[in-house]
Amino acid sequence: MIVVSCLFSCQKTQLTATQILSRSLEAHGGIELWQKVDTLSFTKKTILYNQDGVEEKELTQHQSFYGDNFINGEIISIGADMSRISILGGIYSKSIGDSLTFLTNDDVALIKKSFRSAYYVISQPFNLRESDALLTYKKDTILNGEKTFVVDVSYKENQNSNASDQWTYFFNAKTFLIVAAKVFHSPTISFIENIKFNKETPFAFNAERESIFLNKDGSKDYLRASYLYSNYKVVFKNN
């Protein structure tokens, strides 16, 4: 269930937050088609930078989500020390190389959080529709020379892995694609811009993104990360 509140500025645009989301769902492929997906997999490359703009770390992962509500899946980190975490039928596992790792309760919680965070990112805007999200239309703004709708998102505590984070989404006013997001994850504020989209499947997924750390006044601090997505594969349910 989505609860929507709207500020007076909604009257100016004649669109509510829920209407903006509905159009974004269609622009990204449609909620009905999304609910028919059985398996979603892709490759994600992350490059981290320090404050001087020097590459700090590079990580390539193959992520897969499948089953009802995508509660099953695996995340494989590719490299010299290949690691794998998975959730299969409620069973949590982690391996490094060919060796399985004994999991503590903290390890299980970390794996669960990693999966929820990864799914949260890749499933937008559909997750905004499926989750118990509170959407608040905030204003119009200009982003990269184009009109953009700004919508704040919050969650009820203990009902979403990102409940403690404060999210704001930016929807292009013409295409209704999500073109950026801002998140306050104490103590940092990040502005994540969707630079390119992948439309090789029936959906408009992320292809290239950049995450910029912001100062408290909202000004740019430095580029923290770039993300490249590729090799998307979607398998639909038989029925």
For each predicted feature, which ranges?
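C-terminal motif of bacterial Sec signal peptides marking the signal peptidase cleavage site
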Residues: 6-9
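Intrinsically disordered terminal and processing segments
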Residues: 16-18, 27-31, 78-80, 128-141, ...
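Gly/Pro-enriched, hydrophobic low-complexity segments
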Residues: 146-239
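Sec-dependent signal peptide recognition
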Residues: 1-3
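N-terminal mature ectodomain segment of secretory-pathway/periplasmic proteins
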Residues: 13, 26-100
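Short solvent-exposed loop/turn micro-motifs enriched in small/polar/acidic residues
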Residues: 55-57, 77-78, 133-134, 162-164, ...
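Flexible, processing/modification-adjacent segments and terminal tails
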Residues: 13-19, 93-163, 238-239
